[in-house]
Amino acid sequence: MILSSYNTIQSVFCCCCCCSVQKRQMRTQISLSTDEELPEKYTQRRRPWLSQLSNKKQSNTGRVQPSKRKPLPPLPPSEVAEEKIQVKALYDFLPREPCNLALRRAEEYLILEKYNPHWWKARDRLGNEGLIPSNYVTENKITNLEIYEWYHRNITRNQAEHLLRQESKEGAFIVRDSRHLGSYTISVFMGARRSTEAAIKHYQIKKNDSGQWYVAERHAFQSIPELIWYHQHNAAGLMTRLRYPVGLMGSCLPATAGFSYEKWEIDPSELAFIKEIGSGQFGVVHLGEWRSHIQVAIKAINEGSMSEEDFIEEAKVMMKLSHSKLVQLYGVCIQRKPLYIVTEFMENGCLLNYLRENKGKLRKEMLLSVCQDICEGMEYLERNGYIHRDLAARNCLVSSTCIVKISDFGMTRYVLDDEYVSSFGAKFPIKWSPPEVFLFNKYSSKSDVWSFGVLMWEVFTEGKMPFENKSNLQVVEAISEGFRLYRPHLAPMSIYEVMYSCWHEKPEGRPTFAELLRAVTEIAETW
């Protein structure tokens, strides 16, 4: 529905001895339809009302004395002053460059300027100023759940249960985001009883018509912190009161987007090589340290294996991609050969090896949690218009806390090996590729979706090779004829349906990663 209104706009044009008064009519259209959407990208700021302005000139009725002229309106400010926000540090942060400011966990800071989404200028209570990583702080509001130790924003149901079992205390609890946007779940550890084993209960925090939060309908509160405080002192509908908040805050430092703001080049003299931990498409990978206190993975790039100049330019862009489910790129060493790529270190190594080494030990909930982690990372890449091109279990890594992160996104564009680049080459990942890739070399987020379906299959077969008895040519023929991978025996039908939806012949028939994430999360919450 379109609402139209007519407004008279009067403007005054002054000269040295007279002014002319013009009246214009402007027709304003306001869309009241909730179904209409804005375009995703704007190439320029549009003003549709501009072309609808019509001038109605009026002649001067006489001279206006200079003393009676209306003053011109003041010029608008060149910049809108950004409101300063108070934040609280979630982690300690030691300065890495002279421009950095130290952070101490739980202390408050004032944000002065946001240089980019990942690095902000802040001031501490003593007046010291400097740059800090934005993912180390959170806005200091009583309604902001991130300031509380018991809140975990980005955690799956399985990861929550793993944390609570490690704590293994009656009443140990966390609060986490639920599968429904804007809703939350309390997960509580219940000790063993005479007739029951230890268990973990999950309680949905709901909202009533008055906007109050509750678990037990008789006890509703204006905010979630108030609700948690009440249930820390009263069970009131729960199996036990909330006794021990279980948190990660401060215990596991997240990676930062680069070692500092705009720092993409790393001095090789600042790196110490500890031991070789593997090898890949481009060369040997070492465990190392940067400036003797940050563990890193150092990839030495074999000369001639990569288009180095193109990659260096791309690395500057890749460093701006920062997400808890992506392996963080810290920078590159270009001062001498070979070129080094420095990334976040993941203690449990490659996901494919992790699955094979732990065969028979991983519960189905853990396998689904792996898929959920990867889907979260891929949804972030999709949202930012970035294509992986080689998504597979071999290109995902596992942290010390069993969080899975995506590695090597976009790297295949810089490979110079024809055996890997050509779809007819022996090293080309045909078994993870959709028809439009192996036939026309056409990549998109939807080709990544196909690969994600195959990766899910790898996870639920605990590391089997897809199409293990078929050659690349046979796989191409089978896929073209409509053949798809079978359902793994560890995968319930609900999981296989998600996998299968990724393998639609046409890209437009496949779901987005945002849709896949909702589906996987829904299954995880109902198991």
Curated annotation (Swiss-Prot):
Looking at the UniProt record for this protein, which Gene Ontology cellular component terms does it annotate, in alphabetical order? cytoplasm; cytosol; nucleolus; nucleoplasm; nucleus; plasma membrane
Name the Gene Ontology molecular function terms of this record: ATP binding; non-membrane spanning protein tyrosine kinase activity
What EC class does the entry list?
transferase
Extent of motif Nuclear localization signal: 68-73
Activity regulation field: Activated by phosphorylation by FYN.
Catalytic activity, per the record?
L-tyrosyl-[protein] + ATP = O-phospho-L-tyrosyl-[protein] + ADP + H(+)
Domain of life, per UniProt, equals Eukaryota
Amino acid composition bias (Polar residues), ranges on this chain: 51-64
E.C. number(s) listed in UniProt: 2.7.10.2
InterPro entries named in the record: Kinase-like_dom_sf, Non-receptor_tyrosine_kinases, Prot_kinase_dom, Protein_kinase_ATP_BS, Ser-Thr/Tyr_kinase_cat_dom, SH2, SH2_dom_sf, SH3-like_dom_sf
Query: Where does the UniProt annotation locate this protein?
Result: Cytoplasm; Nucleus; Cell membrane
Q: What is the effect of changing residue 299 to A?
A: Impairs kinase activity
Q: What are the binding positions for ATP in this chain? A: 277-285, 299
The family database entries (SMART domains) matched by this protein are listed as: SH2, SH3, TyrKc
Give the record's membrane topology. Answer: Peripheral membrane protein
Q: Where is the active site?
A: 390
Expression (tissue specificity): Expressed in T-cells and some myeloid cell lines. Expressed in Th1/Th0 cells with IFN-gamma-producing potential.
Which residue spans traverse the membrane?
A: none
Which stretches does the entry tag as region Disordered? 35-79
Domain SH2: where?
Answer: 150-246
User: Mostly located where?
Assistant: cytoplasm
Assembly and interactions?
Interacts with PARP1 and EEF1A1. Interacts with SH2D2A. Interacts with FYN.
The UniProt function text for this chain reads: Non-receptor tyrosine kinase that plays a redundant role with ITK in regulation of the adaptive immune response. Regulates the development, function and differentiation of conventional T-cells and nonconventional NKT-cells. When antigen presenting cells (APC) activate T-cell receptor (TCR), a series of phosphorylation leads to the recruitment of TXK to the cell membrane, where it is phosphorylated at Tyr-420. Phosphorylation leads to TXK full activation.
What's this protein's family per the entry?
Answer: Belongs to the protein kinase superfamily. Tyr protein kinase family. TEC subfamily.
Q: PANTHER family, alphabetically?
A: TYROSINE-PROTEIN KINASE (PTHR24418)
**Record's protein name:** Tyrosine-protein kinase TXK
Per the UniProt record, the source organism is Homo sapiens (Human)
